[in-house]
């Protein structure tokens, strides 16, 4: 008897992903905004529709679109079949019953300043954070540092204050902050983690825009943490991005394309535009003009029209 050949399920090969989207320069048209809102899950659409400020709504929406783009294009799951959930700590994750060929698939997003960013790995625990260097809202930089004194170790403060000008000190402050947040987000502990348990030995001190650096080391509870690596980038003059990655225990997935350290250093951020975000999008809800009307009443639209009081 001749048995029919088994049909093989082709699992796509996946490498790590690093994406960024400039929320600050995105001034959405009515058609863009309504399409974007139709392309996310209803509960997320309702949540984003309640934001007071346009900048926050844009950043949150860009983050959701990046996640769905990632899952649709890298895992070959149709856009309208993707189901995202949140952990008890609020971290977005792919629903456990999704047809995911990578059981340890991990992604993380961050948005701050003018960008939303995403990092993803097929088999590696990952966390990402972005920080924009900006002057404190109130008080001087030394006063700001005094308030934040307990967030860093003595050695970290020595590194931060080793520069002559205060702006560069602030730059280094936010670089350290992004590193700590990337690790905390990677391990998924949320608020309450004592930041002084983490000490970063940053290297190099000066970073070029667009390059990726992996020399920085983590000291955790007084001991060097060798299971974690940190990728650092400057997307532009004012935005630092840190990505924390950890190889999981157990065997690697046979279809995962791993790279050695020399190649990992080339894992630069790809800057996406709006058309990139929705290239694979499938609208899931009817168009609702009220979401555009709400968006038009937020602060940023008033600023754009020059009518802010």
UniProtKB/Swiss-Prot annotation:
Stated name of the protein: L-aminoadipate-semialdehyde dehydrogenase-phosphopantetheinyl transferase
Species of origin: Mus musculus
Protein family membership: Belongs to the P-Pant transferase superfamily. AcpS family.
An annotated GO cellular component: cytosol
Cofactor: binding comment: Binds 1 Mg(2+) ion.
Chain positions recorded as Mg(2+) binding sites: 129, 181
Subunit structure: Monomer.
Biological-process GO terms, alphabetical: 10-formyltetrahydrofolate catabolic process; protein maturation
């Amino acid at each position: 008897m001749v048995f029919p050949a088994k049909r093989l399920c082709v699992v796509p090969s996946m490498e790590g992903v690093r994406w960024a989207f400039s929320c600050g320069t995105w001034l959405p048209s009515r058609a863009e905004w309504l399409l974007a809102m139709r392309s996310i899950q209803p509960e997320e659409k309702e949540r984003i529709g309640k934001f007071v400020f346009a900048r926050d709504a844009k950043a949150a929406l860009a983050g959701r679109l990046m996640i769905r783009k990632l899952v649709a294009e890298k895992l070959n799951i149709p856009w309208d079949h993707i189901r995202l959930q949140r952990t008890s700590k609020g971290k977005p994750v792919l629903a456990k019953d999704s047809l995911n060929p990578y059981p340890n698939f991990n992604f993380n997003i961050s948005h701050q300043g003018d960008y939303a960013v995403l990092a993803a790995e097929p088999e590696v625990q990952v966390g990402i954070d972005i920080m924009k260097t900006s002057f404190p809202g109130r008080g001087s930089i030394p006063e700001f540092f005094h308030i934040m004194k307990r967030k860093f170790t003595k050695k970290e403060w020595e590194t931060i204050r080793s520069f002559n000008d205060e702006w560069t000190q602030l730059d280094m402050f936010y670089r350290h902050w992004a590193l700590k947040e990337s690790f905390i987000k990677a391990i998924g502990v949320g608020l309450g983690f004592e930041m002084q348990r983490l000490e970063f030995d940053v290297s190099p001190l000066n970073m070029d825009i667009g390059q990726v650096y992996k020399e920085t080391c983590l000291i955790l509870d007084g001991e060097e943490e060798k299971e974690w690596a940190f990728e650092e980038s400057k997307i532009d003059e004012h935005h630092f991005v840190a990505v924390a990655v950890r190889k999981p225990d157990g065997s690697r997935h046979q279809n995962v394309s791993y790279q050695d350290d020399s190649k990992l250093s080339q894992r630069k951020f790809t800057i996406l535009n709006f058309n990139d975000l929705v290239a694979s999008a499938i609208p899931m809800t009817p168009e609702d003009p009220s979401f555009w009307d709400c968006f038009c009443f937020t602060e940023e639209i008033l600023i754009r029209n020059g009518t802010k009081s």
